[in-house]
């Protein structure tokens, strides 16, 4: 039985760090107000010359190097983003060029904050279906470029960055002790699309638009949706919350993370938190948190890791992976 095993991981962040106090001269807010409601203390903001493609390519190079591979070993470059460099061609193709890859194929996937979870699921299907042996899965965003910097309810929440993993086909035994992707579950419900969206686009306003969000509505639905899809993953594998070594959630809001972990009965010390230093980086959120926990030695080979995310649409999903 073929499994999709994580071979390497990498990340990249813009140079500029914007602290909560930096917003005090832009909108009516304070460090205390932001921390109390979100857990965010700072975030990275892309500067001149830093784009979704440049950040994604940097994270990709780091992941390929960490895997001990060459760019030419990659069969598929799969980029999760909702802030591409251009409407077309796909930013994944631009990253493919930046890496010097002239074989295989590349495309973008857009599921907003759930994008990396959707991308891992897609990559796993390509690998298990025999269409690719090694897939570079990237989550990269520059949300700072679609924010309304006069809206204090949204501009303080988001940051920019990128994370990437290399998934590789490996023989498994069909057991939950196997390394690799053990289960994936995806969901969406378009009835909620007006609760979190961008008010522009090439086919409607011919503009980029700005992010709009009904924060209370998102919070109201988030915990239930997240825990339901995770419980479905447990049911599919026979695993339980007690088996989880590390819970790596989408880093949108610490209150949502805490409430989800509590409902799932996952101990606080098993939850990876980076929202305080990254803010909400959308599709880059989960791989950035993963890369942080791998780099500091928390996540080790053989650990059972639970990933989840929820984003605009609504879209949401979960992945269980044996590291």
UniProtKB/Swiss-Prot annotation:
GO terms for cellular component: cytoplasm. Its EC number is 2.3.1.180. Pathway: Lipid metabolism; fatty acid biosynthesis. It catalyses: malonyl-[ACP] + acetyl-CoA + H(+) = 3-oxobutanoyl-[ACP] + CO2 + CoA. GO terms for molecular function: 3-oxoacyl-[acyl-carrier-protein] synthase activity; beta-ketoacyl-acyl-carrier-protein synthase III activity. The last Arg residue of the ACP-binding site is essential for the weak association between ACP/AcpP and FabH. Catalyzes the condensation reaction of fatty acid synthesis by the addition to an acyl acceptor of two carbons from malonyl-ACP. Catalyzes the first condensation reaction which initiates fatty acid synthesis and may therefore play a role in governing the total rate of fatty acid production. Possesses both acetoacetyl-ACP synthase and acetyl transacylase activities. Its substrate specificity determines the biosynthesis of branched-chain and/or straight-chain of fatty acids. This is Beta-ketoacyl-[acyl-carrier-protein] synthase III. It comes from Brucella suis (strain ATCC 23445 / NCTC 10510).
